[in-house]
């Protein structure tokens, strides 16, 4: 599967890496020795979809800590971790709590470190494109909050550049700022469709979280991050040269 680009546009890597190891951080035996012979660790591990067996704590904290423990044991020279932007505005969200617990562990580890905080990925906005293709998008809230998401390749360069320098946190956004509603409209235009967006009040989404939590706590925890993030702006310092409009156009070309 590493010989072809991934579903979010990530490049094939089979011919540019020395070794590929597949493991499960919730099964420690599968990642034993993962940092042996490694100088620098780049870690972007996180739970992004519902899992019936594992929580954000299991993956975002414990899973990352298992990698960190081995990095400490192997005396790696630097540990680069990709976390979340605006974490201070969402401290009670389970996903954020787990990521930030790990950030605390990293800072206490005595390893040289950097924490990268992207505000949103083009691949996240790609979900709007998928919905726009169906001809209709449900939008939670008024869609007036702003974001400047970043392309994965531009974020990768920020991570590599963070190898040198002091221990620090780096907030990262892309070159273009849109409201959430504007990103949806951009997706519709890329599909060649007239925007059809139905607004759902925030109270309805929050009520849905409560009901969902009665049946599926893990799903509700992940959804709570998505809902909470729609309540404020996510504008971070601009990095990179790739534009969301072009990303949507590329998705449209593939679909055709």
Predicted regions and their residues:
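Glycine/proline-rich active-site loop of Rossmann-fold NAD(P)-dependent oxidoreductases
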Residues: 123-130, 161-170, 193-195
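Substrate-binding strand-loop-helix patch
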Residues: 146-153, 172-190, 203-209, 242
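NAD(P)H-binding glycine-rich loop region in Rossmannoid oxidoreductase-like domains
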Residues: 5-66, 70-73, 88
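Amphipathic terminal alpha-helices
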Residues: 229-256
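Substrate-positioning beta->alpha
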Residues: 63, 140-163, 168
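Glycine-/Pro-rich loop/turn segments that contact NAD(P) or position catalytic residues
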Residues: 47-133
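Non-catalytic, hydrophobic alpha-helical segments
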Residues: 41, 155, 159, 172, ...
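Terminal hydrophobic/aromatic helix or amphipathic segment near a protein terminus
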Residues: 182-231
